[in-house]
Curated annotation (Swiss-Prot):
Keywords: Protein biosynthesis, Transferase
PROSITE patterns: GART
Enzyme class: transferase
Catalytic activity: L-methionyl-tRNA(fMet) + (6R)-10-formyltetrahydrofolate = N-formyl-L-methionyl-tRNA(fMet) + (6S)-5,6,7,8-tetrahydrofolate + H(+)
Binding site for (6S)-5,6,7,8-tetrahydrofolate: S110, L111, L112, P113
Function description: Attaches a formyl group to the free amino group of methionyl-tRNA(fMet). The formyl group appears to play a dual role in the initiator identity of N-formylmethionyl-tRNA by promoting its recognition by IF2 and preventing the misappropriation of this tRNA by the elongation apparatus.
Protein's name in the database: Methionyl-tRNA formyltransferase
Organism: Streptococcus pyogenes serotype M2 (strain MGAS10270)
Entry EC no(s): 2.1.2.9
InterPro entries attached to this UniProt entry: Fmt, Formyl_trans_C, Formyl_trans_C_sf, Formyl_transf_N, Formyl_transf_N_sf, Formyl_transferase-like_C_sf, GART_AS, Met-tRNA-FMT_C
HAMAP family: Formyl_trans
Gene of this entry: fmt
Annotated disulfide bonds: none
Protein family: Belongs to the Fmt family.
Length: 311
């Protein structure tokens, strides 16, 4: 039985961890995940999906704010793991830790060397890519730059957003890891170096990127909305108040960027730099997420054709 230390945080990671837990060839000695966070206005403490799964299986849990130089680092190095598996962990691993195990493998949600970094799924959708994927790679000190063990891809559909693609890639990543790990560990599967000259990066989404730019084409704005749903969520402004936009559809029509060009009891169409978008699901400031029909029956009632949002 191969003894593993697992590191990860979101549901993507938990899906991969569950695959390892269900496989008798592996024993998870401990998991390392991000600290619990206070969420929302009520500051409700929320544990990570990886921590929740570890609690259900009675696995030791380590949650350092920063792994390097921590007491937790000393403790996990004493567990005697054969190797490390990471998936969307969110921290760099100290070299001393990488050197303490026989192997260290990362499950990364992109087709490397494209989209190294923390938000590959967001950028794949926002950039209008036709496919996304997962790369199983060896871990080195440089971010997502290790040799590649295996790759798998899937089409990005017009109906996909970050949430749906996250779920698809988690399953692909789980299966790809379980399929490739035995051959990798036996030496049968030889890792392939990345072409570093082709590397692109996907840094974590900044608050500035969440704001919609109505001068872009309707396809670009549409991709941007999908690439921010369900988190961190794209937004525009209506009378100085933030209006989050979760879903929209491509539409025809012309007008000034951000201008209301169609308003009925059931639809609100906004012009972009080229074409238009029909808003479907929005969230006004201080309100719950709602359909455009509910919005037009409430706060959006005062909007008129010709008005411009986003200012």
């Amino acid at each position: 039985m191969i003894k593993l230390l697992f590191m990860g945080t979101p549901q993507f990671s938990a899906t991969v961890l569950k695959g390892l837990l269900d496989n008798p060839a592996y024993e998870i000695l401990g998991v390392v995940t991000q600290p619990d966070r206070a969420i929302g206005r009520k500051k409700v403490i929320k544990v990570t999906p990886v921590k929740q799964l570890a609690l259900e299986h009675g696995i030791s849990i380590y949650q350092p704010e920063k792994l390097s130089g921590s007491q937790e680092l000393i403790e996990i190095m004493g567990l005697g793991a054969d190797g490390i598996i990471t998936a969307a962990f969110g921290q760099f691993l100290p070299t001393i830790l990488l050197d303490s195990v026989s192997f260290a493998i990362n499950v990364h949600a992109s087709l490397l060397p494209k989209y190294r970094g923390g938000a590959p799924i967001h950028y794949a959708i926002m950039n209008g890519d036709k496919k996304a994927g997962v790369t199983i790679m060896e871990m080195i000190k440089e971010m997502d730059a290790g040799d590649m063990v295996a790759k798998a891809s899937t089409p990005i559909l017009e109906t996909d957003n970050v949430g749906t693609l996250f779920e698809k890639l988690a399953i692909i990543g789980r299966d790809l890891l379980l399929d490739s790990l035995p051959a990798y560990l036996s030496g049968e599967l030889k890792p392939i170096p990345q072409d570093h000259s082709q590397a692109t990066f996907s840094p974590n989404i900044s608050p500035e990127q969440e704001k919609l730019d109505w001068t872009m084409s309707n396809q670009e704005v549409f991709n941007h909305i999908r690439g921010m749903n369900p988190w961190p969520v794209a937004h525009t402004f209506l009378e100085g108040q933030r209006l989050k936009i979760y879903e929209a559809q491509l539409a025809e029509g012309e007008g000034l960027p951000g201008q209301v060009i169609v308003k009925t009891k059931k639809s609100l169409v906004i012009a972009t730099g080229q074409g238009a978008l029909s808003l479907i699901v929005v969230q006004p400031a201080g309100k719950p997420k709602m359909s455009i029909i509910d919005f037009l029956n409430g706060i959006g009632r005062k909007l008129e054709v010709g008005d411009i949002i986003g200012r």
